[in-house]
């Protein structure tokens, strides 16, 4: 997966999809009560990026619904995965719980109500810290409560705190989440990968490849903009690279030394199916 980073308005969304990105990551802000409000990152953000792009969350969901619906004039077949980077830090536990319910309500309203089941997008609900696990809990409960339990097939989960892998697994076990888990490791593009290292990324890949006992479906690295970093990630066996330059990552993927091993994912590929690094 070539995952376009910080896709917070429609102009940049079109640009990245034109480049060939098959996934987008969007920053979602919340009110103090836990209501999803807008796609917005703000400063600071990645180097060489405009931090203040924004649209309302409802507008964002309507647009991505149109883009992922076959037969719609705006349909883009390469939009496969939408990572919702949820800006939850500072919210109370009550607000987090409300936020999980409200996100489920809004996804259902824009994508799946009224018998609509043909949208092709898959979501990753990306929570900053394991201490905010109640958000995932209430999201899943609300999906069942509103009769959308079958649509959990289109939803995955991710914690982005670069935390201890065993602690993260314990939290997923507590929540009863045993599949559809995307695991990530990374750092802003303003800091060289040299300073971050890849030891945790390698640990995630190893855990993914352990067999039926593993809890990880996919592993992605962020935010990789340099060729050396992208090549290293591919050599390690990641499932996705989040980047500010989707066309650049795709061009590396298409080089002969990589295309024999990798290809860009399509709709026929299950975003939650586990593939081992070879």
UniProtKB/Swiss-Prot annotation:
Tissue expression from the record: Expressed by the venom gland.
Sites where the protein binds Mg(2+): 25, 27, 85
Key words of the record: Cytolysis, Dermonecrotic toxin, Disulfide bond, Hemolysis, Lipid degradation, Lipid metabolism, Lyase, Magnesium, Metal-binding, Secreted, Toxin
Main location: secreted
Disulfide bonds: 45-51, 47-190
Function: Dermonecrotic toxins cleave the phosphodiester linkage between the phosphate and headgroup of certain phospholipids (sphingolipid and lysolipid substrates), forming an alcohol (often choline) and a cyclic phosphate. This toxin acts on sphingomyelin (SM). It may also act on ceramide phosphoethanolamine (CPE), lysophosphatidylcholine (LPC) and lysophosphatidylethanolamine (LPE), but not on lysophosphatidylserine (LPS), and lysophosphatidylglycerol (LPG). It acts by transphosphatidylation, releasing exclusively cyclic phosphate products as second products.
Protein EC: 4.6.1.-
Residues annotated as the enzyme's active site: 5, 41 (nucleophile)
Location within or outside the cell: Secreted
Cofactor requirement: Mg(2+)
Protein species of origin: Loxosceles spinulosa (Recluse spider)
Classification via Gene3D superfamilies: Phosphatidylinositol (PI) phosphodiesterase (3.20.20.190)
GO biological process: killing of cells of another organism; lipid catabolic process
UniProt cross-references to CDD domains, sorted A to Z: GDPD_like_SMaseD_PLD (cd08576)
Reaction(s) catalysed (UniProt annotation): an N-(acyl)-sphingosylphosphocholine = an N-(acyl)-sphingosyl-1,3-cyclic phosphate + choline; an N-(acyl)-sphingosylphosphoethanolamine = an N-(acyl)-sphingosyl-1,3-cyclic phosphate + ethanolamine; a 1-acyl-sn-glycero-3-phosphocholine = a 1-acyl-sn-glycero-2,3-cyclic phosphate + choline; a 1-acyl-sn-glycero-3-phosphoethanolamine = a 1-acyl-sn-glycero-2,3-cyclic phosphate + ethanolamine
Cofactor, free-text remark: Binds 1 Mg(2+) ion per subunit.
A GO CC term assigned to this protein in UniProt: extracellular region
Family statement drawn from the similarity comment of this UniProt entry: Belongs to the arthropod phospholipase D family. Class II subfamily.
Identification of the protein by name: Dermonecrotic toxin LspiSicTox-betaIE2ii
GO MF assignments: lyase activity; metal ion binding; phosphoric diester hydrolase activity; toxin activity
């Amino acid at each position: 997966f070539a995952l376009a980073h910080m896709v917070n308005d429609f102009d940049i969304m079109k640009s990245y999809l034109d480049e060939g990105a098959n996934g987008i990551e969007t920053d979602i802000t919340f009110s103090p009560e836990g209501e999803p409000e807008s796609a917005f990152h703000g400063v600071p953000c990645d180097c060489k990026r405009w931090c203040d792009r924004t649209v309302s969350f409802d507008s964002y969901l309507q647009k991505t619904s149109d883009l992922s619906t076959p037969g719609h004039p705006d349909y883009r077949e390469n939009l496969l995965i939408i990572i919702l980077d949820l800006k939850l830090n500072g919210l109370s536990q009550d607000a987090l719980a409300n936020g999980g319910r409200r996100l489920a309500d809004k996804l259902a309203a824009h994508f799946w109500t009224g018998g609509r089941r043909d949208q092709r997008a898959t979501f990753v609900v990306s929570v900053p810290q394991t201490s905010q696990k109640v958000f995932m809990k209430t999201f899943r409960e609300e999906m069942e409560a509103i009769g959308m339990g079958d649509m959990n097939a289109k939803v995955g989960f991710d914690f982005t705190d670069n935390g201890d892998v065993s602690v993260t697994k314990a939290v997923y076990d507590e929540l009863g989440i045993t599949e559809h888990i995307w695991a990530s490791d990374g750092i802003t593009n303003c800091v060289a990968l040299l300073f971050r290292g890849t030891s945790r990324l390698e640990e995630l890949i190893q855990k993914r490849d352990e067999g039926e006992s593993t809890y990880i479906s996919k592993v992605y690295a962020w935010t990789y903009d340099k060729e050396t970093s992208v090549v290293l990630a591919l050599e390690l066996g990641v499932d996705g690279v989040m980047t500010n330059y989707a066309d650049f990552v795709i061009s590396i993927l298409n080089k002969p030394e990589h295309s024999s091993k990798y290809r860009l994912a399509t709709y026929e590929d299950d975003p939650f199916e586990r593939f081992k690094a070879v």
